[in-house]
């Protein structure tokens, strides 16, 4: 391709928007990422993710959730769901417009680079599969695709 020309990327289904959303949490203790794929980014999907974390992944013990100020994090339904686990959960609200303070935001950047950047996929399912593969590699201690977080704070 000559300099100044724009590459044309074919679209399989022009004019149709397809979305999948990832909810994720980084566990400082075991250096792993817990995640769930959702069709919608809303209070109900986030509550399902909280239940996955607190019931399936960490049924006992206490956890700290660092959360930003996205609207569904502070919805009445989410706050009510969190109140059911108030004896085990400490919510740490991050200041507005400070994604650099949230470790999972660093991981999302890493994930996008490995799973999506400069890659043409044939379907949304292929994009999700690519993302899930990179996510699974984060939880494999021997994988070279892992993003390591410094714990020398």
What function would you assign to each model-found segment?
Residues 1-51, 147, 152:
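Extended, low-complexity cationic-aromatic segments
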Residues 6-15, 83-103, 119:
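RNase H-like polynucleotidyl transferase catalytic core
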Residues 24-25, 31, 50, 68, ...:
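Mobile genetic element proteins and their domesticated derivatives, centered on retroelements
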Residues 35-37, 93, 115:
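Structural signal for conserved beta-strand scaffold positions within catalytic alpha/beta enzyme cores
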Residues 45-64:
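Short, basic/hydrophobic alpha-helical segments
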Residues 61-74, 102:
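Acidic/histidine-rich, metal-coordinating catalytic segments
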Residues 75-85:
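Short, aromatic/basic amphipathic alpha-helical patches
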Residues 90, 104-153:
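C-terminal anion-handling pockets and recognition modules
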């Amino acid at each position: 391709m000559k300099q100044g020309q724009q590459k044309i990327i074919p679209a399989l289904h022009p004019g149709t928007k397809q979305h999948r959303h990832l909810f994720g949490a980084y566990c400082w203790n075991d250096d792993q990422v817990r995640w769930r794929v959702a069709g919608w980014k809303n209070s109900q999907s986030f509550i399902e993710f909280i239940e996955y974390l607190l019931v399936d992944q960490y049924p006992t013990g206490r956890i700290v959730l660092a959360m930003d100020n996205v609207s569904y994090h502070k919805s009445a339904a989410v706050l009510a769901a969190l109140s059911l686990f108030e004896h085990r959960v400490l919510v740490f609200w991050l200041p507005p417009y400070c994604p650099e303070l949230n470790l999972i935001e660093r991981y999302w950047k890493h994930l996008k680079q490995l799973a999506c950047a400069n890659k043409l996929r044939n379907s949304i399912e292929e994009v999700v599969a690519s993302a899930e593969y990179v996510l699974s590699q984060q939880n494999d201690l021997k994988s070279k695709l892992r993003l390591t977080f410094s714990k020398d704070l």
